């Protein structure tokens, strides 16, 4: 299981912002149950395919999702299937106290 870590307040804020979006959480839940590609997720959640693709890329960049390209007999012939990466986030007062205030702070 991936334990997400952060060393600055801005890093933690970005992660919490990413996870604080209901649609991204719904996508994570969906791809934790079964691998899917952007169009399937968009139809399931009632959002646009471009928005689903943006959210999937954000989740993948954060390490919370993995995408794998596969070919299909039907259009689109090349699809990128996503699955959730098991992860945990631990945030408590001690963690917050240990964080640097900014990414430029040296101590």
Name each model feature, range by range:
Residues 11-51, 73-82, 87:
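N-terminal helix-turn-helix DNA-binding core of bacterial DNA-binding proteins
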Residues 73-107:
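Conserved segment of winged-helix/HTH DNA-binding domains
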Residues 62-76:
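Beta-hairpin "wing" of winged helix-turn-helix
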Residues 43, 60-61:
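Alpha-helical residues within the helix-turn-helix
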Residues 1-9:
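Long, low-complexity, charged/polar intrinsically disordered regions in eukaryotic proteins
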Residues 10-11, 66:
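Short, conserved clusters of charged catalytic residues that mark active-site
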């Amino acid at each position: 299981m991936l334990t997400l870590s952060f060393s600055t307040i801005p890093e933690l804020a970005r992660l919490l912002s990413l996870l604080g979006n209901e649609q991204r959480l719904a996508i994570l839940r969906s791809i934790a149950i079964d691998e899917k590609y952007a169009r399937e997720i968009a139809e399931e959640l009632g959002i646009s395919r471009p928005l689903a693709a943006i959210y999937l890329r954000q989740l993948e960049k954060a390490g919370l999702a993995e995408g794998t390209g596969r070919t299909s007999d039907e259009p689109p012939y090349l699809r990128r299937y996503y699955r959730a990466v098991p992860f945990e986030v631990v945030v408590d007062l001690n963690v917050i106290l240990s964080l640097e205030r900014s990414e430029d702070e040296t101590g």
